[in-house]
Amino acid sequence: ILAKQYLFRFTKFYFSHLISLFKINTNNIVNKPKKNHQIFINMVKENQLSRENINTYNLIKKNKFYNELIKINIDEKFFNDLEAIILFIGYSRSGHSLVGSLLDAHPEILISHELHFMKHLLSGVTANNIAESIVINSAIFNKNGREYTGYDYSIDGQYQGKVKRLRVLGDKKGNGTIRIIRKYPEVLTLLDKFNVPVKFIHVIRNPYDNIATRAKRNNTSLRFAAKGYFKNMEVITRITQNTTFEVQHVLLEDLIYKPEATLNSLITSLDLERPTENYLNACKGRLFSKPKETRFDYSWDPMLVNFISKKIKHYEFLKRFQHRPF
C-alpha cells in the first residue's frame, strides 16, 4: 500500500514538474519572465519533487526579476556572519514543521522547508549552492502564508523568509535527513564543507502519538510505523554519541506548555541572545493549547504496547515516557 502511495505521488509531482518547466520556458521565450514568479512559488510550496530539486533554485536564480521575488540580496557579504548550520532529525509527524517555522521567524535565522539538505550534500552540490537554495526556499515558502499539510505555520509580524543579519542557517527535513544518514553514514564527514559548526535539533513527541499519526497519515499498521520509529531512534542515538555535533532535544509538550522557557533554551543553545518578548508572544500565538493525542484513535494490541514500552527504555532522550501510563 505504501509503495503504491509513493508511486502515485511521485507520478503526480513528476508531471506537474514537467508542466512547470514548460510554462517557464514558454514565458522566457515570449519575454515575460515575471509571469514565472507564481510558478516558482507553486513549485516550492506544493510540489515535493520540485522543492527537493536543486535545479529548481538554480532556475529561480536565473530569473530576470529574481531579487524582486525573494526580496533578499544574496551578495558576497550575505553569509559573512554565519555561525552555525542546523538540521532537524527525528520522525515525521513529530512537530518539526512547527519548530522550524518558529525558528525561521527569528531575525537571525533562516530555515528552509524540506529542501533535503543531506541529499544534495551527498550528491556533490557545493556548500554555497546549498546555502543559497536554503535562503530562496525560506523566502518563497513564506509567500502568501506559510501553510503546509493543512496547518498554518505563519508567525505574525516576525522574520519568516527574511533576516536582519544571518547567523544561523538550516533545513527542516527530519525523517529524510535520518534516512540519508542511516544509509550513508559517511555523509556526516561532508558537513565540514560548511566551515561552521553543525547542530542537530530533535523534536520529540509522545512516541505513541507519533507512531499513531504516522500510521494514520500513511495508511499503514501501527506495528510497521513503530518499527520505523525505532529505526530512526537508533540513528539519532549514534549522532548523539558523536562528540563532533551538538544535539538539542526539544519536547513538543514542553514547547506547548512552557513555550518561553523552551524557546529561550533552544535559541540560546544556538549561541544567540535570548529572544525578545515580541518574538516569544508571536510564537506562543501559533501553538496548540495541548498536544494532539492521536494514540486514542486506535485500539492497540497489548503485545505492541509492550514492545514499544520496552524499546522506549533504551533511549535516554525518551526517558520522560518510560513510566508514563499509556
Model regions: which residues?
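PAPS-dependent sulfotransferases, especially Golgi type II membrane carbohydrate sulfotransferases
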Residues: 1-87, 92, 215, 233, ...
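Glycine-rich, histidine-containing beta strand-loop boundary motifs that form or position
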Residues: 92, 101, 113-115, 202-204
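A conserved segment at the C-terminal end of the G1
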Residues: 97-109
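A generic secondary-structure signal for well-formed alpha-helical elements
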Residues: 106-113, 270-274
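PAPS-dependent sulfation machinery
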Residues: 110-194, 321
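A short, structured active-site edge motif that brings together acidic residues
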Residues: 115-118, 204-206, 279-281
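A polyampholytic, Gly/Pro-enriched intrinsically disordered region
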Residues: 131-140, 221-226, 296-303
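PAPS-dependent sulfotransferase catalytic domain
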Residues: 162-277
